[in-house]
Amino acid sequence: MVSLDKAVIARLRKGGEEFEVLVDPYLARDLKEGKEVNFEDLLAAEEVFKDAKKGERASVDELRKIFGTDDVFEIARKIILEGEVQITAEQRREMLEAKRKQIINFISRNTIDPRTNAPHPPSRIERALEEAKVHIDIFKSVEAQVKDIVKALKPILPLKFEEMEIAIKIPPEHTGRAISALYNFGGVTREEWQRDGSWICVMRIPSGMYGDLMDLLGKVAKGEALTKVLRRIG
């Protein structure tokens, strides 16, 4: 449970009345992004208020009338998702910077410059975000807003969502370490063992992650892995 001194007010006007709960601002953000959260950790008090600052609680009858339930967790979910979370200016700056970094990283990994078929460096994406004056919603997930952001950036920065399908062959002496590393990396769609003990797989990854994959193969297969780009999808 978040402490009262770290909690902020989430407020919803419904049925002509205002209802408030005291919440952890970061868990409230996670809930708005569509993530599951523990409501015992989210709420500073398992109460629904008419005025949290005055400690004025909403009555059970009123909650049932307006929300159709007196379950505090269910009501808190509705207040957070449908209402407004009153975060501080410092919290907003912190959340905005974190979200900006997530968006830059996502765009760098999942898009390419169609002129070069290579990903844009994060610094270039960051400059384009500033130049385009893109609005970033701290309460939306990256996935929910990145397509609109990329659309806004395209007049400034050529971008294209693209994936690659890559065939990889690992020599027998490196399979133990390489296989687990590639599965942890993600994107293995097919695999096959060869009679000589080597291992072949096909991976599908965002094109922006190709460099990371090559770096990984260099480490786990000592530069002895064979790779071939089968196709680009996008």
UniProtKB/Swiss-Prot annotation:
InterPro entries associated with the record: EFG_III/V, Ribosome_mat_SBDS_CS, Ribosome_mat_SBDS_N_sf, Sdo1/SBDS, Sdo1/SBDS-like, SDO1/SBDS_C, SDO1/SBDS_central, Sdo1/SBDS_central_sf
What is one GO biological process annotated to this record? cytosolic ribosome assembly
* Coiled-coil annotated residue ranges, if any: none
Name the Gene3D superfamilies for this protein.
3.30.70.240, Ribosome maturation protein SBDS, N-terminal domain, SBDS protein C-terminal domain, subdomain 1
Pfam families associated with the record: SBDS_C, SBDS_domain_II, SBDS_N
Q: Which family does it belong to?
A: Belongs to the SDO1/SBDS family.
The name on file for this protein is Ribosome maturation protein SDO1 homolog
